[in-house]
Structures are given as C-alpha cells and as structure tokens.
Amino acid sequence: MKLSCMLIEWALYVCPAVLLATQMSLAASLETLKCEGPVSTEHSSCLAATEEDEGDDDMARSGEADFRFKGYTFSKPFHLIVSYDWLILQGPATSIFEGDTLVLHCRAWQDWPLTQVIFYREGSALGPPGSKSEFSIAVARKSDSGHYHCSGIFRSPGPGSQETASPVAITVQELFAAPVLKALPSSGPQEGGSVTLSCETKLSLQRSASRLLFSFYKDGRSLSSRGISSEFRIPEASEEHSGSYWCEAATEDRQISKQSPELEIRVQALQKPATPETPPPAKAPGPLPLLPTPSDEQPVFSFSDPYLTYRINRLLRQMQDVRILLGHLVMELRNLSAHRKPATTKS
C-alpha cells in the first residue's frame, strides 16, 4: 500500500515518514515538502491510490495516522503555520506522550545565530542563558505540559536587542491510565477457594501497539515481577493470603510506571457445622431447707366467748399445719423434676 499526501489550504495531509517540514516555520525559511511514490497532482493535491482498495466507497481507518477513502490512503493532518516574527519557538510536530523525548527549538529569522538564549515554561526560566537554541526533556511527563516560549539576542546582522517568541502550548498526553487492582470473585474469598487478581489499565489508542509489563505486591513483598500477564492467581486461598495488595504497570524500558491503590483482601475462614449443645449434668439435690413445724403456741385471737375463741384458734393451727405440709410437697416435686430432666433430653 502506497502512502499519500494532500495539501488543502492551510491543512496539510502528509506522510510523516517522507515529509520534511516543521510545525511552525518562518516566512523567510526554506522548507521542503516531499511526497514519494507514483502520485497524481491534480488540483494541487498529492494523492496515492491503493491498488487493492480502488472503488471502495467506505472510509476505513488503519493505525494511528492514515485512513482510506474511495481507494485513496491519507495520512493524519499536518498543520503548517508561517510566522513573520523575529523569533519563534518550534514544538514537536506530532503528539507527545509520557516517556517520549520533548524537543523545542528557538529559531531566528533566516536562522540568524542567537546568543543568550533562554527557554521558559509558564513564565519561569528553565535554565541560565546560553548559546544553544535547542531544549530537550529526555523523558516527558504529564507535569511537563504547559506554555513554553524562548528569548534570545541576535548576533549581527540582527537587530541586536533581545527578542521573545510567542508562547506555544505543549501537552504531554497520558500513555496509559493508572491501574486499578480488582479481585475476582471478590476481595473476601472463602478459605480454600481460588482468587484472581486483575491489574486493569488501558493504553492510549494512538499507542495501542505499546506493551506494558505488570508486577504484583502484597504487604510490601513482590509476588510477581514484570510479567506480560495482567493477572495473578491464588489457586487455594488461606488466611495467610489476607493482606494489602497492589499492582504496578510499567513500560518495557521502565521509563513510565504507575501503581494501583491498595486493595485489602480478607480470606474468610470456613464455618464449622453447628452441633447441639449438651446440657450440663444436674446437680444432686441438697438437703431440704428447714420448714417450720406445727406450733403449739396459743393463738393471738381472743373473744368474749371462750368456746368461739377455742374453735377459731384450733382452725388456725390446722391451716398452719396444712401450709407446712404443702411446702414439703413442693420441695419434693422440685427434686423429682430435676432428676427427670437429663433423661428427657437424652431420649
């Protein structure tokens, strides 16, 4: 399949591998746009038809850059900006992701030599003045995003005064999201069951071809280091596997690595089947408490009629004797009940 280029007004659709151009160019600079291969240049366009896709009316995207439409393959857009300033800051022409090298160029009118060059981010100088017109960050991070500009003094035949370039917004895109550790089937597995830890993250669509390596940790101790699998399996969980787990996803060159939040796993012990409780053996009955005995004391009732007094007091003494006998009977029944309970439970 042959790649193609198309120039439409200010938007330039190019083949990144063969185009010699910059994101921002000075009006007096000489830039070369080159489109290789058998092409058609009708209507100031640079196109290349694909042999196998001619006549295809549907648009199909492939990869991060090019797409096909009606038999033609196009690269992603390239925006060319022409400036008439004395000094410009030239940023990267393609998207910058975490781990990439970020290179900035401070370019003067007609590439006149500069001195006392300073690069800035968000208005703060990134270093002392120098003669180098290039600034680079070997491993870009998201925190390196911001507005950059540069300043410098022209050597002859320039104006001789310090010039400052307009700010350029630089965005370092996230290569992959911070991972999240998940436990399947749950973070509270039963003892003896299996547990699978999954370190979940996703690469940026434009860098989906990159490969990540995964590591797993428990309580600060490494369980698995830099493997291609995003899962770690515990075949038979026990109480020893309870603890704090986390995972790490990293690029192959280890330039970018991110850790997941900790996940607390508590293995639940197996519950033993409930057994019927055996009642404690009944205590042997102790001696019966002393009960009052019939009293021969004279009753306290007294009437004017001696015979009535005699009959009333005798009746009261008989009632007292009955009460004492009933008390003895109740105690006997309690003792008998205490002896019969264990036999009833066993049966």
UniProtKB/Swiss-Prot annotation:
SUPFAM superfamilies from the UniProt entry: Immunoglobulin (SSF48726)
Alphabetic keyword roster: Cytoplasm, Differentiation, Disulfide bond, Immunoglobulin domain, Repeat, Signal
Disulfide feature: C106-C150, C199-C247
Subcellular location, record wording: Cytoplasm
GO molecular function terms listed in the Swiss-Prot or TrEMBL record: transmembrane signaling receptor activity
Comp. bias (Pro residues): 276-292
Domain Ig-like C2-type: 77-166, 179-257
Chain positions covered by the region annotation Disordered: 272-296
Signal peptide: 1-27
Any one cellular-component term (Gene Ontology): external side of plasma membrane
Keyword Transcription regulation assigned: no
UniProt GO BP: cell differentiation; cell surface receptor signaling pathway; immune response
Keyword Secreted listed: no
Job of this protein: May be implicated in B-cell differentiation and lymphomagenesis.
Oligomer status and interactors: Monomer or homodimer; disulfide-linked.
Protein name: Fc receptor-like A
Organism whose genome encodes this protein: Rattus norvegicus
Gene: Fcrla
